[in-house]
């Protein structure tokens, strides 16, 4: 088996042991005589799968009992519209814009009310996170929205807004399950699964009970399209229609992996911090590559860097691919390179990448 180190921002690497388990079950899931891909979502087998997956998420994240968990199609991008449709009860919400996806979320929310930009880091090309304690929030805001880890620009929040009476909504697509999270700080957490959880095709939302059953100002709850209505979908246990069955199954396997092989999110965080430290320490210790992010806001999951010029960046990416380090090309908005070192990236992959980077530097400096 000749597997490469895949540094893609998403879809991304999955743990090999999870892939092997899925492979073993592929043709005959637990004596059912069929694949999870083939079985009815109303079958007893799939009922066991979805219950197992939800229980796994609750245990791994320590989700309080007053939160519901939903499995949705449409990815995190669909959540950009679902959040304001369901939660913007006052007609306004505060958005902290720290990158491309929080910008898109604010633009989508503006279709349903006022998406007030309470703070932005655009002035320094999104290389930092605004001080959340120094922001003047709108007391009439229905919620405060953040993208907690910025995949494209390689930044992350070290602290999150906490304002009495205003729920916090967070897109955690590129950092969920990378470290312990105090779910009780949030009204809603949502994430696309294709970065750090499962194959592409699903988003998961964790929503506090008291936020359900509402709607954007001027839009009666019964007028929200059925497949965009959190309450309707959660009342049907995410099975109003056929859910993304395979993604739900794979998410359950990843929850098993995090519990049984890693030992929980505290252990996962130690591993992830160590991996990121290796790469950032190398970047800081030489002058051929540059990481533009202010150190206190650096992402543990997405590490951005450039070489001396765009032509050298292209040469680096081509050489890296040839050497078995794939998908290191940076996002088109920022260029350069990006190493996404999610949970499934082994420490050896980061060590080997650093060795390759040093070899390339010596040959091209």
Task: Kindly label every feature range from the protein language model.
Residues 15, 193-280, 294, 363-365:
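Active-site C-terminal subdomain of aminotransferase-like
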Residues 32-79, 86, 100, 108:
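Conserved N-terminal alpha-helix of the aminotransferase class I/II PLP-enzyme fold
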Residues 10, 109, 121-176:
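Active-site phosphate-binding strand-loop segment of PLP-dependent enzymes
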Residues 77-144:
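PLP-dependent aminotransferase-like
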Residues 169, 183-194, 203:
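Conserved active-site segment immediately N-terminal to the catalytic lysine
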Residues 289-319:
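Conserved PLP-binding catalytic core of the aspartate aminotransferase-like
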Residues 3-4, 322, 331-365:
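PLP-dependent enzyme catalytic core of the Aspartate aminotransferase-like
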Residues 3-54:
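A glycine-/small-polar-enriched, mobile loop at the entrance of the PLP active site in fold-type I
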